[in-house]
Amino acid sequence: MTMGFVGLCRARSKLKRKPKGFMKNEIGIHEGIKTVGVDNYCDFSSSSDLCICVVTWNMNGQVSYEDIEELVGRDRKFHLLVVGLQEAPRNNISRLLQAALVESHILLGKAIMQSVQLYVFGLKNSELFIKELKMDKYAAGGCGGLIRRKKGAVAIRINYNGTLMVFISCHLSAHTRNVEERNSQFRNISDSLFSKIWNPFSRPAQITIWLGDLNYRLQGINAFPARSLIQENLHKLLTGKDQLLQEAERGQIFSGYCEGTLAFKPTYKYDIGSNSYDTSNKVRVPSWTDRILFKIEDGDKINATLHSYESIDTIRNSDHKPVKAHLCLQVNK
């Protein structure tokens, strides 16, 4: 069976060798996910070869230019800005993003599969540093309704100034009970992306970043106890109920990946137009459905520092809050 680039990375993670010192501020290790702390200070100096801002947002079929501006932020010093969207409306999101970033960044590449979308922007003139740019997608069902809830993933493989990266924006199956279905979708996406262009002489990605509505929920706790902990700013105590971390600890998904500490509140499900959790009859348990995870494959050559991992609570036009990460790389060539 032909194995894609991402699948190759996942297979390589089974090797016993573990690179040392490639990720600063390591806090704890699950079987599959390494939890890392945040170094809040970044001066965008020459000490970092590549600073990447990564944003994911389930839009719930709604968009405004004001939300797009808030999504990309006011700090425009990043070398790359990666935006992953789920349940994106039929509007020309690419045009809105380019308008918001017109003074600082240009669109380098995009991958779109209906409502699942991915955009990579770079500083002006950064197209000169692109040595490879490929797109791929994997469909896993869904699509109906006005919101077009397509499930699956889109991906961009990019060689930026000699650093080979893969970005994956995904939307996995919903509902607490569908853990195994999400696990299976993760594996299928990993094995399928870029498999048609794979050959034994190709380099695997040096860094792979997954972002999206992974839809893993809190399990083993009801809505009201969970909300009570959140209201008391004790939501960190809920991480032990998080299906994503549980499944990673079982070795089912995201082996070898890193994620920042879940210091922000669960990002789903909110009443639209507010910062209040779901008041409908369903009374859903708040969950960290929206995540950003990354894997450094070449630990001898890349040192990574996570400078932020947070939700954007000022955006209220969806039942999800966007999540943003700021990751800087030092590359030893």
Explain the meaning of each model-derived region.
Residues V63, N92, I130, T176, ...:
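Activation segment
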Residues S45-S47, W57-G61, R76, L85-R90, ...:
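Amphipathic alpha-helical protein-protein interaction segments
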Residues G37-D43, S64-L71, I93-R95, S104-L108, ...:
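Eukaryotic intrinsically disordered and solvent-exposed regulatory patches
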Residues E87-S173:
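Structured beta-strand-rich core segments of catalytic domains in phosphoester-bond hydrolases
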Residues W57-M59, L123, C170, D213:
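Cofactor-binding loop segments of dinucleotide-utilizing enzymes, especially the Rossmann-like FAD-
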Residues M1-Y119, N178, F186, E249, ...:
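N-terminal, active-site-proximal structural segment of metallo-dependent hydrolase catalytic domains
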Residues Y160, I168-S173, R177-K333:
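Catalytic lobes of large eukaryotic enzymes
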Residues S48-V55, K77-L81, E103, S115-Q117, ...:
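Core residues of folded domains in eukaryotic genome-function proteins
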